[in-house]
Amino acid sequence: MNKIERVKNALRGEEVDRPPFSFWYHFGLQHMPGSKHAEAEIDFFRAYDLDFLKVMNDYPFPLPRGLEAIETEEDWKSVEPISADDACWKPQLEALSMINEAIGNQALFIDTIFSPWTTARRLARGGNLTEARRRSPEALLSAMASIAESLASYAREVLARGASGIFLSLGAATDDVMTAEEYATWGRPFDLKVLEAVRDAPFNVLHIHGSRIHFDSLLDYPVSALNWSHFNTPPALGEGRSKSGKAVMGGINEATAAHLSAPEIADQVSNALNETGGRGLIIAPGCSVPTDTPERNLRAIRMALDRRTS
């Protein structure tokens, strides 16, 4: 079974020769041209013989002209939609095209998109939207609608560059930021705007970041797989698989990945297989692995899979 078949079967909950696996981290190349980013991603994919590539995307969303950060109601009102051919997307799209040319016939790849809320938070002065929600709710909602439209346009272009879907990262679907009821206003409509743009893609993943996540209220999102830090927040991996009926990506505790021994990593892989029966499972961390994770620990993931399924 080749990499593409293995991932597609896992997403459908069908039999696989072994569960596919992958992992990712922030390369810190957001100040480099897209070609350098692509080279790092391709080298990483080949070095660890991953079953698919989750492409990191750390290039910043542009601020309105003349602003260093968004702070006032008028600032939020100045946020307008950005088309897919805007220069701000160029480095990442160039990287995706190069990745497709290099590995597109061997494996699927998906691009990371941070949710409209997360994107807005990064634009705000101090990275905090609490004051904007309280003092300028209509202006913030309007800005988020523009951001969602921009990200939806970008997501469609991602597919045109050869990606099989997107990895939509939600940073506020957690009680640590807001309630599920509040997220229904401030997050959900804008998330769905982005996902609707790529609804027909075969490999869309929802990453629910943080602890105390709103898992149950997100189960109707149109994605093929779910990813969350199940070692640090409910539900457990097997429970999430049963509740959602979707494929799950997990098994590896990213918070401890840099410090575990190979036998401890093997235990995590075995536990994931036991919880899910190995169906509808992609072995992966619940979030990015630390950049100081030793090579031997990353290689131990594949070795554990091979031993368990041989």
Give the residues covered by each predicted segment:
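N-terminal capping/small domains of soluble enzymes
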Residues: 8-11, 15-78
